A protein has these predicted regions:
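N-terminal onset of structured domains
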Residues: 7-50, 61
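A beta-strand/beta-hairpin structural motif
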Residues: 28-32, 83, 89, 93-95, ...
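Structured domain cores in non-transmembrane regions
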Residues: 40-104
Length: 171
């Protein structure tokens, strides 16, 4: 269960994170939900690409100081509608993979899960310490075309990010 989080009408949401030990490595699988606003859908239909970053941090919990960040990485997705092909294209900017879909829900479905994402080796963790995995889906408003950016910062229909969600790492 997450330690924090909430959902907005238009936003991404971290639904579930599962961290397991496979061999000597901890791996993460996660599920997300994307709720696009009408304005975001309209912009995409007009050829505007939308970008999300799935941010993952592994934190060592400390009582006295701020938590120590051991891992800080992101997976970046770009989704764009191609009117001539009547298709949605999702590109994983992190590895260059490109996928085409006939529906928006199918395209968002690809971005809605991560499987077997390597986090850290078991021998890099101190057994008596506590660790948290922090996950967030961030919509990149700075990647929007310049005329849309000011609107995206004041219009709630462009607040398409999730909050940070914390999950304990069970050793």
């Amino acid at each position: 269960m997450p330690l924090s989080g909430n959902a907005d009408e238009f936003a991404a949401q971290v639904k579930q994170v599962q961290i397991t030990l496979q061999g000597e490595s901890y791996i993460m699988s996660a599920e997300f939900v994307y709720q696009l606003s009408e304005k975001a859908k309209e912009a995409m239909k007009n050829g505007v690409p939308l970008f999300w970053d799935i941010q993952v941090k592994l934190l060592q919990h400390r009582e006295v100081f701020w938590d120590k960040t051991l891992i800080d990485t992101a997976i970046r997705y770009r989704i764009q509608y191609h009117a001539l092909l009547n298709m949605y294209r999702v590109r994983n900017e992190s590895d260059g993979e490109v996928y085409n879909f006939s529906t928006l829900s199918s395209a968002l479905g690809l971005m809605s899960s991560i499987h077997d994402f390597p986090l850290i080796e078991k021998n890099e963790l101190v057994p008596e310490k506590n660790y948290l995995c922090a996950v967030k889906v961030s919509f990149d408003r700075e990647a929007l075309p310049l005329p849309l950016r000011p609107i995206a910062y004041i219009d709630p229909q462009w607040y398409l990010s999730s909050d940070w969600t914390l999950w304990p790492l069970k050793k």
